[in-house]
């Protein structure tokens, strides 16, 4: 399926920061150009984080904005964001930028010397001036056009919901499909949040026992982006979508509006714990990974398989195969820097290959998983720095993958696309035998 559509900057920055967004877009090019001329820096060691850990520093009151994401009509056009037709628009909640800024100001060390490292101060500088620091802050608190492109595609595609095509029959012995989602360079994680909303909407249509499962891994180089933006966004969206205990304000059209959430009034830590327990009961789980891409990162996404308990009894893994899952990798604005395209491409194909070995090439319980895939949204070219779609596609093909255009974005600015990346037949044969 191929769509052609466009977004303006005003569709993105609901905090009244469209001008700042444009300036930060220019900073991406400057940062990538500087990064490509310098020798590679030591990357941060990848680390896994839990939702509980990341929400521990959440303040007692959280301000949030609401973003309405349109789906596509059958003719490939974006629906009206004010449409009341079922499924036409999905509302996604995100923590307000000014709320993140307020927390960073509270955490910054005012007595630190200029040369001393103060992460909060560095991140605050990035928010206030639009400065990007390679390997420290690369715009993760902002919402970019490509993330919206990807979110619209997610809510439009009928087979991305927690239910597989042809598996919606409650009498099906194999049951509904299990989904795994990995978002790289997640930032505000809008595409994943849109997918979770879609999953929960489908859950309401069927008994819980037939609701499928959703396992999400959200990844960002910066652990503070995960802590201050990504995890709070997950919490807000699940809380509003699934809980009858918490309501949100509505605008004059009856749509969700911006607001404030008083966590202390609603139970504080007990509310957070109860919400995470509800996620588990709904077969929804979230994990988070910070740090740089590479072999260690891949091991956190898909840990090496330990010997099975049955092996010591003389049984083989073929006698105890895993239950299949569908894998979808999501990524947006991750190919702007020529110095990181190779590592990013290796990471995408590495995750696809790991999943293929475990759930597609190997024996599984029930139906085999379909081939894993990745959806990568990017600008066609990042002027002046060499990054962009063409270089990424060349790297995908060089490493044994293949790609095709799913979405072609046409507007007054730089062209944007969403690519689907899969393993080539030769790559799949190689992966199955390793």
Task: Give the ranges of each region predicted by the language model.
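S-adenosylmethionine-dependent methyltransferases
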Residues: 1-434
């Amino acid at each position: 399926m191929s769509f052609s559509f466009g977004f303006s900057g005003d569709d993105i920055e609901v905090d009244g920061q469209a001008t700042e967004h444009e300036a930060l877009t220019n900073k991406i090019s400057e940062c990538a150009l500087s990064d490509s001329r310098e020798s590679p820096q030591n990357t941060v060691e990848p680390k896994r984080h839990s939702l509980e850990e990341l929400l521990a520093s959440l303040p007692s009151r959280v301000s949030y904005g609401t973003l309405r994401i349109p789906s596509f009509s059958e003719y490939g056009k974006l629906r009206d964001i004010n449409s009341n037709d079922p499924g036409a628009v999905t509302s996604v909640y995100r923590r307000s930028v000014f709320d993140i800024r307020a927390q960073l100001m509270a955490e910054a060390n005012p007595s630190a010397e200029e040369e001393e490292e103060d992460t909060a101060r560095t991140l605050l500088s990035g928010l206030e001036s639009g400065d990007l620091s390679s390997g420290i802050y690369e715009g993760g608190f902002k919402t970019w056009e490509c993330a919206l492109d990807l979110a619209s595609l997610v809510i439009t595609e009928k087979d991305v919901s927690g239910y597989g095509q042809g598996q919606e029959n409650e009498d099906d012995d194999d049951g509904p499909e299990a989904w795994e989602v990995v978002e790289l360079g997640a930032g505000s994680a809008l595409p994943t949040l849109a997918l979770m909303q879609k999953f929960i909407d489908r859950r309401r249509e069927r008994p819980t026992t037939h609701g499928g499962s959703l396992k999400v891994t959200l990844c960002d180089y910066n652990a503070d982006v995960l802590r201050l933006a990504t995890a709070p966004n997950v919490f807000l969206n699940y809380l509003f979508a699934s809980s009858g205990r918490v309501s949100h304000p509505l605008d004059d059209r009856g749509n969700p509006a911006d607001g404030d959430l008083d966590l202390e009034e609603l139970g504080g830590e007990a509310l957070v714990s109860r919400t995470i327990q509800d996620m588990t009961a709904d077969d929804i789980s979230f994990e988070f990974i910070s740090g740089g891409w590479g072999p260690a990162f891949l091991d956190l996404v898909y840990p090496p398989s330990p010997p099975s308990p049955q092996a010591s009894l003389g049984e083989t893994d073929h006698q105890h195969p895993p239950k299949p899952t569908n894998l979808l990798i999501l990524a947006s604005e991750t190919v702007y820097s020529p110095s990181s395209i190779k590592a990013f491409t290796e990471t995408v194909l590495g995750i696809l290959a790991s999943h293929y070995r475990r759930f597609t090439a190997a024996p599984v319980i029930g139906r085999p998983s379909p081939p894993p895939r990745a959806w990568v949204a990017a600008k066609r070219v990042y002027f002046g720095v060499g990054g962009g779609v063409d270089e990424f596609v060349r790297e995908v093909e060089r490493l044994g993958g293949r790609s095709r255009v799913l979405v072609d974005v046409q507007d007054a600015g730089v062209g944007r696309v969403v690519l689907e990346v899969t393993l080539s037949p030769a790559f799949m044969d190689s992966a199955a035998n390793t």
